[in-house]
Amino acid sequence: MHCLPVLVILLLLIASTPSVDARPNPKDDVPLASFHGAVNAKRYLRTLWNSRDCCDPKEPCCFIG
């Protein structure tokens, strides 16, 4: 019975600790939406580059990445 108050206090302390989501974001964190924009831009540039008449499509000079 001596351990019961200690156990209750520990459970209350564990329940009151802040979760991982409660911590503030640093200024250098970049939201994932900005990365999606970069992917779309790269896809658009690749489409433009491949659609121009630079050489035979089988040649590597017509493809990016």
Curated annotation (Swiss-Prot):
UniProt KW keywords: Amidation, Disulfide bond, Neurotoxin, Secreted, Signal, Toxin
Tissues with expression: Expressed by the venom duct.
Superkingdom of the organism of origin: Eukaryota
Broad class of where this protein is predominantly found: secreted
InterPro entries: T-conotoxin
GO cellular component terms given for this protein: extracellular region
Prodomain positions: 23-52
Annotated signal peptide: 1-22
Modification type Isoleucine amide: residues: I64
Family designation: Belongs to the conotoxin T superfamily.
Protein name: Conotoxin TsMRCL-05
